[in-house]
A protein has these predicted regions:
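Single conserved hydrophobic/aromatic residue that forms the stacking wall/gate
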Residues: 152-161
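Small/aliphatic-rich secondary-structure junction motif
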Residues: 2-54, 61, 147, 155
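Glycine-rich, Arg-bearing micro-motifs that act as flexible, cationic patches
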Residues: 108-130, 144, 148-149
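Structural beta-alpha unit
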Residues: 1-2, 75-109, 147-149
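General small-molecule cofactor/ligand-binding pocket signal
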Residues: 36-38, 84-88, 140
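A short acidic, glycine-rich active-site loop
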Residues: 55-69
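Short, hinge-like loop/turn segments at secondary-structure boundaries
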Residues: 52-56, 101-104, 127-128, 155
Length: 161
């Protein structure tokens, strides 16, 4: 029998991660598991936190607090108030996701993929692919809707001209 006591959703505020959240929420509900939702704040983007109107302070702490607040808002809007939100600052999202999965003893990781191909995949890499290769548990990869993939593919072709 499959037990999903602890489910981790990797969340990057994209439409695909909303879909991943819905999968994770439904699985947690069906299996009676605990739902964890993790956002990895980019180290570079935390430097922009120094410009927040709250004044001076630790930019990393401000960026983390802002991401956590936004994450809680989305969880409430997506009918996942029981989810346990978390934000980590890390230079490598894939490593941070796998480390967090180990920390919470995740039975499943749910992650969206942006479906990049070609040059953009080579340049940006694939967080989902790295998580699949290194995760301590099974990984459910949620693909973007067909229209999202076709829009991204079109913009990629246009950028190659």
């Amino acid at each position: 029998m499959i037990l999903l006591n602890s489910i981790l959703v990797a969340f990057d505020f994209s439409d695909t991660s909303i879909s991943a959240l819905n999968y994770g929420r439904n699985l947690a509900h069906a299996f009676g598991g605990r739902l964890h939702v993790l956002n990895i704040a980019d180290v570079i983007s935390t430097s922009a936190a120094q410009f927040y109107p709250e004044g001076p302070g630790d930019p990393e702490a401000k960026a983390t607090a802002l991401a956590l607040s936004q994450l809680k808002t989305i969880l409430a809007a997506e009918n996942a108030p029981e989810a346990r939100p978390a934000v980590r600052v890390a230079p490598d999202p894939a490593v941070a996701i796998v480390d967090f999965a180990k920390e919470i003893h995740a039975d499943l990781i749910v992650i969206g993929t942006h479906g990049r191909t070609g040059v953009s995949r080579i340049l940006m890499g694939s967080v989902a692919e790295h998580v699949v290769r290194t995760a301590p548990c099974p990984v459910l990869v949620v693909r973007p809707a067909e229209h999202e993939r076709s829009e991204e593919h079109t913009s990629e072709l246009q950028s190659q001209r």
